[in-house]
Amino acid sequence: MRVLVFLFALTLAAQTRMSVEQLRGFLKSSVELHHPDKSVAGYLKKTKLTNRLEPRQFEEFIAMGAGPLTVEALRDLMVATKELPAAAPAPVKVAGPVIPPPSAEEQKRVINEARDYAMGYSKGLPDFLCMQVTRRYIDPSGLGFYGQQDVINARLSYFDQKEDYKVVSVNGRSVDTPMQRLGGATSSGEFGSMMKELFEPNTAARFDWLRWATLRGKRNHVFQYFVAQPNSHWTINYQDRQQVTPGYRGLIYVERDSLQVTRITLEADIPVDFPVQEAQTTLDYDMTDINGRGFMLPLKAEVRMREGKHLVKNEVEFRMYRKFGADTTITFDTPEPLPATATQETPPNN
């Protein structure tokens, strides 16, 4: 059973950095969602741009429908960034050839093969250790730009098909506190249970082929799926006081050649009276070497939730996989985040 635990903690970095392109998206979203002019302007006053805001862009942003306080904040940003380099031009997108979808028979075969793979996934994994790095971000304004709350390093051991987590440090400081007692949002189920539950017969998920995609250089089938609430085992626990098991939907990526699952996305259909109004998860798998053998193992999970206007985002990376053994050691220095290209989907190729 995959469980999300939501315990909101209000700790936020003082200043947000963003590019002009990110600023454009932020303003567009703010206008569409009718955020108060005062709130948007206040947020921009705590924002530092990474490149120059040009006069033509300033005029473009005004034309979007920015309020007078936001316009004044944008003018201040234009003055403050006049010595910064201009943003690089957006790359030109070239449309590739249209790739026909597989036949209905092939689509059915792919799902059946993926189901067999998912049901036997945990049994096929070796005993191992790895480092789990969780970077947690929050946005109490609800405007969509996050400040980092903390970085949690944990030792994750997988032995006899069971996961065990031990927190090693928080923000580089050694601690001996269980994950569930750290507060904030946490998640579990990356090592097989999320995937298996989706394909369980009693879950009765409906799968529909959607499109092709390229992920980490390989072509994937992308299916959309739907799980009705009565068949769901996916749970959200709110502050250990309330719990809900909603229906959910999302996408599942299946590598064309190996028929292994490489990504699962999930969006919960949460009852309107539950404190957490939105919950989304994306889980990526990649081929990883353990003791000279390749295994498809979790690479990164991203969890997003919303309570009222409070937004939470967790980025969970799984690093330094090692074969489980009495003499196995891992250095728990926090690595640099994975590059965006590690989980970036690209247009389908031939």
Model regions: which residues?
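Sec-dependent N-terminal signal peptides
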Residues: 2-12
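Short hydrophobic/aromatic-rich motifs at helix boundaries and adjacent loops
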Residues: 1, 28-32, 182
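General marker for long, soluble alpha-helical cores
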Residues: 14-94
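Short, solvent-exposed linear motifs at loop/edge-of-secondary-structure regions
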Residues: 6, 52-59, 63-65, 215, ...
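Structured extracytoplasmic
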Residues: 86-248, 256-262, 267-280, 286-300, ...
